C-alpha cells in the first residue's frame, strides 16, 4: 500500500470540514462522502459546506463528492472517518466494498455504542483491518479555529509510527503542527473521557461554580483519566502531553466545546432531551459516559467524576445534589 494515496473524508460535519481544509492544503484533490444528496448539491452551488463552518471556502473542482459510500471507498486508499460515533455503524452497514486493505484514520472522539469498543478496535474486529493500518487523529483542536487558521496542534497515533509520520507531514501546514504517537488506545480513550469531563465542567458552570472550582475539577479529571488509562491500557505515557491534557483543557474550558455547552444546559435545568434538541449537534460525551461506565464495571477504577455525570444524565439525579457530593471527594 502506497500511502496516503487517494484520501477520502467520511462525514459532513464541522470536524470533517476542518479536516478537508487541512488535506486540501497539500493534496491536489480528495474524495468526500456525505450522506445527503441535497447537502452535496448545496455545497457545490455555494462553494462551502451549507451547514457547518460556512466561512470556509472550497474549490469544489478539487473534490469528488458522493452520497454512495461504496463508490467513495472503491476510489480511495485512505479513509478518514469523522462521523459521530452513534451513527458509525449505520453508515458502515451500507458497505459492500471491503475495507481491510484500506488505511483507516479515525477522527471520531467516541466509543461505538452498545459494542463498547473504541473505534480502532471496532474496525479490526468487524472489518479485519490490521491494527498497523489504523491511525487515530486527536488533539486540542476545535474545528472552528482550524477554519480561522489559528495555530493548532494534532497528534497522529498508529502502531506503525512510520505510517503516522507520513500522515503527520501531509496534514501539517502553517497553522497545523503535528506529532506522532503509538498510543492508539490511550489516545482514543482519553478523547472519549475528555468529553465526559467537559460535560462535568459545563454542569458546574450552569450551577454557578466559579473558576476556582473548575480548576480543581479539571485537576481531578486528569488524575481520574490517568488511573483509567493505566488500568485498561498500561503504557509508559505522559498524560501532560497536549493530546491528553491539552485536549481536556480546551474541551473543558472553550466556548466552542459542544460537550461543555451541553453540560451547561443540564446544570441550568434542561432535561437531556431538551438540551439535545436545542443544540442540534451531537455531544459525544453523553454516549461516552455510558460506554465508559459499562467498561469500568470490569475494571473497578475509582472514577467519581464519571459516576457523577452518569448519575445526572442517566439516573436523573439532581445536578445540585450530585455535584455537592462530588465536591466532598475532591482535594
Go through each PLM region and give its residues.
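NAD(P)+-binding Rossmann beta1-loop-alpha1 motif at the extreme N-terminus of oxidoreductases
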Residues: 1-56, 63-67
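A short helix-to-beta-strand connector/capping loop
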Residues: 56-65, 129-133, 174-176, 301
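Rossmann-like NAD(P)(H) cofactor-binding subdomain of soluble oxidoreductases
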Residues: 66-74, 78-151, 167-169
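Internal alpha-helical scaffold of NAD(P)-dependent oxidoreductase catalytic cores
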Residues: 87, 98, 126-133, 151-238
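NAD(P)-dependent Rossmann-like dehydrogenase/reductase catalytic/cofactor-binding core
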Residues: 194, 201-205, 230-331
Amino acid at each position: 500500500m502506497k500511502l496516503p494515496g487517494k484520501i477520502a473524508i467520511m462525514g459532513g460535519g464541522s470536524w470533517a470540514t476542518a479536516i478537508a481544509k487541512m488535506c486540501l492544503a497539500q493534496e491536489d484533490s480528495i474524495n468526500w462522502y456525505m450522506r445527503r444528496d441535497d447537502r452535496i448539491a448545496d455545497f457545490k452551488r455555494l462553494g462551502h459546506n451549507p451547514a457547518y463552518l460556512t466561512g470556509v471556502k472550497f474549490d469544489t473542482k478539487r473534490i469528488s463528492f458522493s452520497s454512495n459510500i461504496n463508490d467513495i471507498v472503491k476510489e480511495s486508499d485512505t479513509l478518514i472517518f469523522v462521523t459521530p460515533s452513534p451513527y458509525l455503524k449505520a453508515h458502515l452497514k451500507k458497505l459492500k466494498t471491503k475495507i481491510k486493505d484500506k488505511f483507516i484514520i479515525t477522527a471520531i472522539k467516541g466509543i461505538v455504542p452498545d459494542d463498547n469498543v473504541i473505534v480502532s478496535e471496532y474496525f479490526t474486529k468487524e472489518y479485519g483491518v490490521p491494527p498497523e493500518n489504523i491511525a487515530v487523529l486527536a488533539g486540542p483542536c476545535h474545528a472552528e479555529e482550524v477554519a480561522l487558521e489559528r495555530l493548532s496542534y494534532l497528534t497522529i497515533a498508529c502502531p506503525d509510527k512510520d505510517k503516522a509520520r507520513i500522515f503527520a507531514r501531509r496534514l501539517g501546514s502553517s497553522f497545523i503542527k503535528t506529532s506522532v504517537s503509538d498510543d492508539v488506545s490511550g489516545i482514543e480513550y482519553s478523547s472519549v473521557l475528555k468529553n465526559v469531563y467537559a460535560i462535568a465542567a459545563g454542569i458546574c458552570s450552569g450551577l454557578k461554580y466559579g473558576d476556582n472550582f473548575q480548576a480543581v475539577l479539571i485537576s481531578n479529571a486528569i488524575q481520574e483519566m490517568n488511573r483509567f488509562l493505566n488500568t485498561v491500557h498500561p503504557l509508559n505515557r505522559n498524560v501532560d502531553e497536549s493530546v491528553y491534557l491539552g485536549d481536556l483543557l480546551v474541551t473543558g474550558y472553550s466556548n466552542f466545546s459542544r460537550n461543555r455547552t451541553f453540560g451547561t444546559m443540564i446544570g441550568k435545568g434542561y432535561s437531556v432531551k431538551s438540551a439535545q434538541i436545542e443544540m442540534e449537534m451531537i455531544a459525544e460525551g453523553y454516549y461516552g459516559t455510558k460506554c465508559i461506565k459499562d467498561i469500568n464495571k470490569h475494571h473497578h477504577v475509582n472514577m467519581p467524576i464519571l459516576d457523577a455525570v452518569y448519575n445526572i444524565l442517566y439516573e436523573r439525579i439532581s445536578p445540585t445534589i450530585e455535584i455537592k457530593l462530588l465536591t466532598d471527594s475532591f482535594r
